[in-house]
């Protein structure tokens, strides 16, 4: 991992990992390492290494801990855990006159609010979690109901993601059909 990202972005000391292995609100556990890739290609590289080594991967953006999904929960896992913190991969691409966006894994609701302001628009989710730096993905996942139903749906129409196929190999799925280079 260190040879791929550099030691600055691979945290292995307990004190370095603490902020990333404990949610602000909920969840805490041990991780072998916390890695902080800066590009989609670096995320892909890290994922491939983790799949090859058969470690558990927890993808993490803002780590608000609102639902406990971004950190280990306890210490009784059957394999080591690597947390991939995506906050350095935070580009937001505005498309269709501000009606749609492509938000990379670490992009935040606060950043989106700033970008959409140029179009006289605001994000679907502008309550609570926005002020603690929640990611766009987290905002869509956690804030698409309740009081926000009146604003209409917040959802992911198309996505770029990785999955492990039936042969145990990492596979890139690009529903967006936008070409990314590193």
Regions found by a protein language model. Give the residues of each.
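N-terminal flexible segment immediately upstream of the FAD-binding catalytic core
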Residues: 1-48, 65-100, 128, 142
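Structural detector of well-ordered beta-strand residues that form the stable sheet scaffold
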Residues: 58, 102, 124-126
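Extended, alpha-helix-rich binding/interface surfaces that flank or overlap catalytic cores
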Residues: 106
């Amino acid at each position: 991992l260190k040879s791929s990202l550099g030691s600055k972005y691979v945290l292995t000391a307990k004190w370095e990992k603490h902020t990333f292995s404990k949610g602000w609100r909920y969840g805490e556990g041990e991780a072998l390492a916390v890695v902080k890739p800066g590009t989609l290609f670096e995320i892909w590289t890290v994922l491939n290494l983790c799949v090859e080594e058969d470690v558990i991967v927890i993808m993490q953006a803002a780590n608000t801990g609102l639902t406990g999904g971004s950190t280990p929960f306890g210490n009784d896992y059957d394999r080591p855990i690597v947390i991939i913190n995506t906050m350095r991969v935070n580009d937001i691409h505005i498309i269709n006159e501000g009606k749609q966006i492509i938000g990379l894994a670490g992009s935040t609701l606060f950043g989106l609010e700033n970008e959409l302001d140029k179009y006289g628009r605001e994000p679907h989710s502008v309550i609570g979690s926005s002020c603690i730096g929640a990611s766009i993905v987290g905002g869509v996942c956690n804030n698409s109901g309740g009081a926000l139903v009146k604003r209409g749906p917040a959802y992911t129409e198309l996505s770029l993601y990785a999955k492990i196929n039936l042969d145990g190999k990492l596979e890139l799925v690009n529903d967006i059909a936008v070409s990314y280079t590193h």
